[in-house]
């Protein structure tokens, strides 16, 4: 039977609850416990699939095709465990489920209310994750901040949850901020005291406090927090600002987070094996020469819009013992000026996914520059589509070559809408989503990198390579190195006579892990490093 840990946040938003939950998951897994992590998001969207990246950051896609919060990416990367659509819950999805049940008559004519129906649905979702995953411990992160109106149903639900299970099967962790007041030279505990008071007023007494701070928390402050907040002294956990999110599990282990959590859950504190994780941190803190990577995107004002891409690059650099020198390049600025101006001194170019016309010509210009100047290049999703358009326009010289998404009247739509998408009107959850197989062709870079005949990658797209032009591309020197098993969909393309030029329709960044970088990103960094060494 599963045990349950609930992670709440206080004082300010974006305090790092997701990293704390993911780090605890890593620590528990290193002790031999199986873990699943669930995110409860208080917004009314059914999922983040239709939200602007500027509003929400990236949309993380699970194996079973759910469009979820980026925190699920942290959960997967830290625990190396695949999450499912059950691991992402929003207020919108809860209300949708309850209203659908009411329409079906499932409540036998009763008045549908927040309590017990909404809170009951939330509790049911948590139990469902436990039964589906068979995890020893289910960690649930509650989005938002204690005191927010929109979070109240979730907080009430996790209060009620303690009545569903045995007393020692539930633990509450509260992540909070201890601000440092520069003028007085003091760390203030009052905001945390008020946050815990607010949590208690709901009926939740936290078992552990994880205290974010940029200054060390002395024993006197810990005793003060212990006394005012009713938390065991050993359960006041210091969480100092870290040089990398990947060092957080080691810091929290030192502070005893996992040990105290297991004590609260009445579970054995088994021997901890973090040797591989410590090696990752060692390589991260002792990098070799820098690799200057340009990420050419349209949402670069918010780095979280490309979070998994950046982490995948970082994983590859850690494994290759290189320093990631990441340069954010606006595709629109390239349109205004030139690719040469922004990319003349980079070692690699990555063009990630996206939607719509804005910045596309800048991406295409970047790809042309990478192709002609022999700069290692990796295109992802829309990045592959732009690579196809670039080749069609500048090498094959097809008049008006484009994508039917970008130009519905194009006389040469080398990228077109998937046939099964033609009658779909709704936007949310209707793309080609989740894991699909891809068969790799012999004697290709793709086959060499993966060393597999069939791979499984995650997708999120409506448009695809137009097979009407396949032979034209092959005859002109393009290699189609990966397709769907039936050969109908082009999944991976590459160029010969180039140090590294690959583009894929899928999202390989979602499968990259610290210590296990994705082959395409590993290949990109390796090719960049080798090209640098040859130029010396």
Curated annotation (Swiss-Prot):
The gene is pyrG. This is CTP synthase. It comes from Prochlorococcus marinus (strain MIT 9515). Transmembrane segments: none annotated. PROSITE patterns: GATASE_TYPE_1. Signal peptide: none annotated. ATP binds at residues 14-19, 71. Residues 1-267 are annotated as: Amidoligase domain. The keyword Metal-binding applies. Allosterically activated by GTP, when glutamine is the substrate; GTP has no effect on the reaction when ammonia is the substrate. The allosteric effector GTP functions by stabilizing the protein conformation that binds the tetrahedral intermediate(s) formed during glutamine hydrolysis. Inhibited by the product CTP, via allosteric rather than competitive inhibition. Homotetramer. Pfam families: CTP_synth_N, GATase. Residues 292-534 form the Glutamine amidotransferase type-1 domain. One of its GO terms (cellular component) is cytosol. CTPSs have evolved a hybrid strategy for distinguishing between UTP and CTP. The overlapping regions of the product feedback inhibitory and substrate sites recognize a common feature in both compounds, the triphosphate moiety. To differentiate isosteric substrate and product pyrimidine rings, an additional pocket far from the expected kinase/ligase catalytic site, specifically recognizes the cytosine and ribose portions of the product inhibitor. GO terms for molecular function: ATP binding; CTP synthase activity; glutaminase activity; identical protein binding; metal ion binding.
